[in-house]
A protein has these predicted regions:
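Short, surface-exposed loop/turn microsegments at beta-strand edges and helix-strand junctions
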Residues: 87-95, 104-107, 111-113, 125-127, ...
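Well-ordered mid-protein domain cores that form the structural environment of catalytic cofactors
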Residues: 103, 121, 133-143, 174-188, ...
Length: 489
């Protein structure tokens, strides 16, 4: 078990962000018509009681209900591109292709590329500004807003694109569908049955409160500003990464991937084997990156250097006792660390954990997080609203030595070059893994120009702060939606 330290015991006063609460929905009345429609079933499991209660709540609300889609609805157009067979290819010869699971990421990075020979309309797949995105299969009901960051990105046909007649309805409907009530209704039909596949036609059957234009505008403005701050944070990250690459004179990765053989072959000296005999550890690109760092940096050290980190924590497996929101700590997994506010986050009780165990589990602002199993090498920096959240044991925590290095460390590890240095340590035949010892040995350069390094650090921290502010604005929009629209009487 990892011992605690004074830095990790520091308590930061956070502005209070109201918890968006909904009334407990445990019962409802069912009409005889609904019973016959459900095959004369009388068991409660045939009806989503909470969804039916939510519909009753809206009917009794302050504002009249309006259909999302249809002649008198709020939606101008809702569609998804036609299905097509995907022809995947390498990065140099394809178009970056994004999956629905990346829709809610703050800064999506393409994991796949599709060939330009693919029989589809690429322009139709590209996202347009002022569009609401909605997943239609798999995990349905995930909501996203197309901002400058995602404009022009090619997403799959599993994403419904929605535009609105009135501009302010975009942010308003976004906030409603993000709320507990709205998302619950989106995933169920009129009888309360869970929908496994969502089509644009389903939106015509969904009715939401039609609040006054001034209230809609207020909510929309908060959502728009929240996404604008995310865009600004991404621009700062891009600028910091550019400065890093320029300072170290790092060439594009493709230039480092040279091969003169028809298959990937290379020789390794025994003295440099590090007792690793798996080829992935010795790929030449890693050595070329390290050689470039050594030639251009003032010094190349490792994450384990006390000037870089205070601790590298790989928590042991821990028992999870799940509780309701408001009664425990937020638990997030590796798939969620690139999201601002994970929609599928869970809550666990910490009542049974000792202080030492809890300190090894919870994270603090500006901690760098690295996924260690499955998809290895996803990197995030903890924003302020993640203070005391608990990532799963599949995420390694790197506690920075100080605020002066926290942002710089994140920028380097999140770069393409940092990713190569992380994934070189991958081991495992079925499930890929790395551990905390591997992370401690990852190379990190100190720049020759300390001012440039400090600038990179400040840009990263400023970006992280903007993401916290974006989170607060979205929570404010959800709070207004909850208090002044859904529960208004």
């Amino acid at each position: 078990m990892v011992n605690g330290n004074l830095a990790r015991q520091e308590h930061i006063e956070l502005p209070e962000i109201p918890l968006v609460k909904d009334d407990p929905l445990k019962w409802c009345s069912v009409s005889l018509k609904d019973i016959f429609a459900r095959g004369k079933r009388l068991d409660a499991s045939s009806f989503d009681v909470e969804a039916k209660q939510a519909r009753s709540l809206l009917k009794e609300g302050k504002y009249p209900l309006v259909s999302l889609s249809g002649t008198d609805g709020l939606i101008k157009d809702a569609f998804y591109p036609g299905r097509f067979k995907r022809i995947y290819c390498d990065n140099n010869h394809g178009v970056p292709f994004y999956l629905p699971s990346q829709m809610t990421e703050i800064y999506p990075r393409a994991e796949k590329h599709i060939s330009k020979l693919t029989n589809c309309d690429i322009d139709e797949l590209k996202l347009k500004l002022k569009t609401l995105l909605l997943t239609r299969s798999g995990t349905i009901g995930t909501i996203a807003y197309v901002s400058q960051t995602t404009e022009g990105m090619v997403f799959s046909d599993d994403v419904i694109r929605i535009t609105f007649k009135q501009e302010y309805d975009l942010g308003y409907v976004y906030a409603f569908l993000k709320s507990k009530i709205g998302n619950l209704l989106l995933k169920t039909n009129g009888y309360g049955s869970v929908i496994t596949h969502l089509e644009p036609e389903h939106l015509s059957n969904m009715r939401i409160p039609n609040a006054p234009a001034i209230l809609k505008q207020r909510i929309n403005d908060l959502v728009v500003r929240s996404y604008a701050l995310r865009d600004e944070s991404n621009e700062l990250i891009d600028e910091a990464t550019r400065l890093l690459i320029e300072a170290l004179k790092l060439p594009p990765l493709e230039e480092l991937k040279t091969s003169t053989a028809p298959v990937e072959t290379f020789s390794v000296k025994i003295s440099r084997s590090d007792r690793r005999f798996d080829a992935s550890y010795h790929v030449p690109i890693v050595n070329k990156i390290i050689e470039q760092l050594q030639s251009q940096a003032a010094e190349v050290t490792t994450i384990g250097d006390p000037r870089i980190s205070k601790e590298v924590i790989l928590p042991g497996r821990f028992k999870r006792v799940y509780v309701e929101e408001g009664h425990g700590r937020v638990l997030i997994g590796g798939k969620q660390i690139n999201e601002l506010d994970p929609a599928t986050k869970k809550y666990i009780s910490v009542a049974k954990y000792s202080k030492k165990i809890l300190e090894s589990l919870e994270i603090h602002t500006n901690t760098t997080l690295i996924t260690r199993s499955g998809t290895i090498g996803k990197v995030a920096i903890a924003p302020r609203h993640w203070e005391h959240w608990i990532p799963s044991d599949h995420i390694i925590r790197v506690v920075p030595a100080s605020k002066k290095i926290a942002g710089y460390l994140y920028i380097f590890l999140a770069s393409d070059y940092g990713h190569e240095l992380i994934t070189r340590y991958t081991y495992g035949s079925v499930v890929d893994e790395i551990d905390d010892n591997h992370v401690r040995n990852i190379c990190v350069p100190f720049l020759k120009d300390a001012a440039v390094q400090a600038n990179i650090n400040e840009l990263a921290l400023a970006a992280n702060q903007k993401r916290y502010e974006a989170y607060k604005l979205e929570q404010e929009a959800l709070q207004i939606m909850n208090d002044d629209v859904i529960h208004a009487r």
